[in-house]
């Protein structure tokens, strides 16, 4: 798939612009704080309905304005698809082919993206919430039922925690009903994640083995707060653990186990990657991103759109070349940079844009 054009109205520092893109490589050059990252963020926003940089929707709306609008024309194997998102203090509306979508899960997945940004390097040593977010974003794009199960799980989790925090005497029968619902959705979430990590590991290991000159193997492990030896045992073990921890949950007024507590661990040659070098971390994340591209193609039948936000400066010449080698000809790619000087072996077929103070000029 590839995005043919995009329109931004009152998005960050962009008042009103329309840009058309190359089907292959698009490079945005500009000094810092001119709007390069904002532009890539808008493409990400059109795909996932939210920013990867902030949880505050208000920050996305241009100062002094009440709403923003992002629209674009997507090309997929089955034809052209107009997409549109409108965001205001009343909420957001999403449209596919000019038709309003009742749920975000009906919209997300239409346009898939893989983002590689400097903050992705925190994935290995950062907090578990970063790694759960990584799973939720990537898996949610290629498996809509995952978003539905996750949303239902979070809804019941919120209910359970609110009930535990209430001053009422705990009704164990009512709590058991919540536990049953939590386990129903939570066990599905865990199973979705296990399948995803298994498939991602296969692809990522191939890339990492190549990037490391056939010296290193990569493994990703899913660390569940619910212990099990087989998928069929997840539900029963989850329910038993909730009951075992019930008094502790009542005392702490919080739910102590479930997929909202789960984590990932990365291993290079069976050693925890958190103890690895910066070079190994960069190779690992690069392998993950290339694996995401292949996995998206395998599941959806379309390559995703690749967004490289100022990461080329984070990679040495060797890893830049490996990245560009790993990008297939039919993967539309967007790169932001302050200079073309440190970019290695860029193909001749590219479209160059200059960004200055919220203005986008193509060359």
UniProtKB/Swiss-Prot annotation:
Signal peptide: none annotated. GO terms for molecular function: ATP binding; single-stranded DNA binding. The RecF protein is involved in DNA metabolism; it is required for DNA replication and normal SOS inducibility. RecF binds preferentially to single-stranded, linear DNA. It also seems to bind ATP. InterPro entries: DNA-binding_RecF, DNA-binding_RecF_CS, P-loop_NTPase, RecF/RecN/SMC_N, RecF_2. Keywords: ATP-binding, Cytoplasm, DNA damage, DNA repair, DNA replication, DNA-binding, Nucleotide-binding, SOS response. Pfam families: SMC_N. Gene3D superfamilies: P-loop containing nucleotide triphosphate hydrolases (3.40.50.300), RecF/RecN/SMC, N-terminal domain (1.20.1050.90). The keyword Phosphoprotein does not apply. Belongs to the RecF family. This is DNA replication and repair protein RecF. It comes from the Bacteria. GO terms for biological process: DNA replication; DNA synthesis involved in DNA repair; double-strand break repair; SOS response. It is found in: Cytoplasm. The lineage of its organism: Bacteria, Bacillati, Bacillota, Bacilli, Lactobacillales. One of its GO terms (cellular component) is cytoplasm. It comes from Streptococcus mutans serotype c (strain ATCC 700610 / UA159). ATP binds at residues 30-37. The keyword Mitochondrion does not apply.
């Amino acid at each position: 798939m590839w995005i043919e054009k995009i329109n931004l109205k009152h998005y960050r520092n962009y008042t009103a612009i329309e840009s058309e893109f190359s089907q292959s490589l698009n490079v945005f050059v500009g000094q810092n704080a001119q709007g390069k990252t904002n532009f890539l963020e808008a493409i990400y926003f059109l795909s996932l309905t939210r920013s990867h940089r902030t949880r505050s929707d208000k920050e996305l709306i241009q100062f002094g304005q009440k709403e923003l609008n992002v629209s674009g024309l997507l090309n997929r194997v089955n034809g052209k698809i107009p997409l549109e998102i409108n965001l205001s203090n009343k909420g957001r509306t999403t449209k596919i082919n000019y038709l309003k979508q009742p749920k975000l899960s009906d919209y997300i997945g239409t346009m898939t993206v893989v983002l590689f940004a400097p903050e992705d390097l925190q994935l290995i040593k950062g907090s578990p919430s970063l790694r759960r977010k990584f799973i939720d974003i990537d898996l949610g794009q290629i498996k809509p039922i995952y978003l539905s199960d996750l949303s239902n799980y979070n809804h019941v989790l919120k209910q359970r925690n609110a009930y535990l925090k209430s001053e009422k005497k705990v009704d164990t029968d009512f709590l058991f009903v919540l536990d049953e619902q939590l386990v129903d959705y939570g066990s599905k979430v865990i199973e979705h994640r296990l399948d995803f990590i298994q498939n991602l590991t296969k692809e990522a290991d191939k890339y990492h083995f190549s990037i490391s000159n056939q010296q290193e193997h990569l493994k990703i492990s899913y660390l569940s707060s619910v212990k099990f030896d087989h998928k069929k045992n997840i539900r029963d073990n989850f329910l038993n653990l909730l009951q075992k921890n019930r008094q502790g949950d009542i005392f702490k007024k919080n739910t102590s186990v479930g997929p909202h507590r789960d984590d990932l661990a990365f291993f290079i040659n069976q050693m925890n990657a958190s103890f690895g070098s910066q070079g190994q971390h960069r190779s690992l994340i690069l392998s993950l991103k290339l694996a995401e591209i292949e996995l998206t193609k395998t599941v959806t039948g379309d390559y995703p759109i690749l967004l490289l936000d100022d990461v080329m400066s984070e990679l040495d010449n060797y890893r830049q070349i490996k990245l560009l080698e790993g990008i297939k000809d039919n993967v539309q790619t967007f790169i932001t940079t302050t200079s073309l000087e440190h970019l290695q072996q860029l193909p001749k077929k590219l479209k160059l844009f200059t960004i200055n103070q919220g203005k986008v000029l193509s060359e």
